[in-house]
Swiss-Prot record:
Name of this protein: Protein FdhE
InterPro entries in alphabetical order: FdhE-like_sf, FdhE_C, FdhE_central, FdhE_N, Formate_DH_accessory
Species assigned in the record: Shigella boydii serotype 18 (strain CDC 3083-94 / BS512)
GO biological process terms, semicolon-separated: protein maturation
Record-linked Gene3D superfamilies: FdhE-like domain
Primary location recorded for the protein, binned into one broad class: cytoplasm
The keyword Cytoplasm is annotated on this UniProt entry: yes
GO MF assignments: ferric iron binding
Domain of life: Bacteria
GO cellular component, one term: cytosol
Gene: fdhE
Length: 309
């Protein structure tokens, strides 16, 4: 079952009631999203072998929070949603949606915010990006969206993605439509933008016990039932792995049918878990899954594959 975005004026009353039962989509809640992520990254950096990199990621997340409010986006997506709905495509499809110059404006603002905090190689990277031409930046963005990671160095990718993510999250936050669940394929990709998840989370509160995948680009979350592979939708050969015990707040769900895994975070075990931060801070679990022969079915926005990986 995939999820398609339906314009508000095309939803019947029965569909509106159905959408209220189990929300198929949770559009990004941008207020304090990046500050919460930055705080969680700093907290997880304590006594973590990746402490320096987690603090580095926290700096980027904090800069995203500042730039988000300094550079708001105004855009009417009504026509785009109608067109995408008619085509059965995500409304903000990364493979077809033309990129506005706004995302490069966000990138330059991020660089300006981060410069005073950076030194050494990291400072050299953002200064290099600052000097890049408009076309060079567009080429890097296109390569990342095409998963051509060998064309973008892994030290530049997090900065490019941080700006693209801000842009797409701002657009997703403006979608004036509703969502309904309908049968289809490719539920492993975000129904709003078509990007990959970073991790999944079993939530508390109004969505208690429901699992949502978190988009690594537009920050949307979409519902996928538990005990089913989020990559191939099979359920017969799933295994759950953790570094601590059965009550761990972070587990990896592996599937022997497709040979992949995705992390699951449990808010009931640790209410402060955050989709990006906790995924990044648990790379030891990724190493274990690689040893077991499984491939990761997601990408963390702060950790892109390098050339040859």
């Amino acid at each position: 079952m995939s999820i398609r975005i339906i314009p508000q004026d095309e939803l019947g009353s029965s569909e509106k009631r159905t959408a209220d039962m189990i929300p198929p989509l949770l559009f990004p809640r941008l207020k304090n999203l990046y500050n919460r992520r930055a705080e969680r990254l700093r907290e997880l950096a304590e006594n973590n072998p990746l402490d320096d990199y987690l603090r580095f990621a926290a700096l980027i997340a904090h800069a995203q929070e500042v730039v988000l409010y300094d550079h708001p986006l105004e855009m009417d997506l009504t026509a785009r949603i109608k067109e995408a709905s008619a085509q059965g495509k995500p409304p903000l499809d990364i493979h077809v949606l033309p990129r506005d110059k706004h995302w490069q404006k966000l990138l330059m603002a991020l660089i300006a915010e981060l410069k005073p905090e950076m030194s050494g190689p990291a400072l050299a990277v953002i200064e290099n990006l600052e000097k890049a031409s408009t076309q060079e930046l567009e080429d890097m963005a296109s390569a990342l969206f095409a998963s051509d990671f060998s064309s973008v160095s892994s030290d530049k990718a997090p900065f490019i993605w941080a700006a693209l993510s801000l842009y797409w999250a701002q657009m997703a936050n403006l979608i004036p439509g509703k969502a309904r669940a309908e049968y289809g394929e490719q539920r492993q990709y975000c129904p709003v933008c078509g990007s990959m998840p970073v991790s999944s989370m079993v939530q508390i509160g109004t969505t208690q016990g429901l699992r949502y995948l978190h988009c690594n680009l537009c920050e949307t979350e979409w519902h996928v039932v538990r005990v089913k592979c989020s990559n191939c939708e099979q359920s017969g050969k799933l295994h759950y792995w953790s570094l601590d015990d059965e009550q761990a707040a972070i587990k990896a769900e592996s599937c022997d049918d497709c040979g992949t895994y995705l992390k699951i975070l449990y808010q009931e075990k640790e209410p402060k878990v955050e989709a990006v931060a906790d995924d990044l801070a648990s790379l030891v679990l990724d190493a274990r899954m690689e040893q077991e022969g499984y491939a990761r079915s997601s990408i963390n926005p702060f950790l892109f594959p390098g050339e040859g990986e």
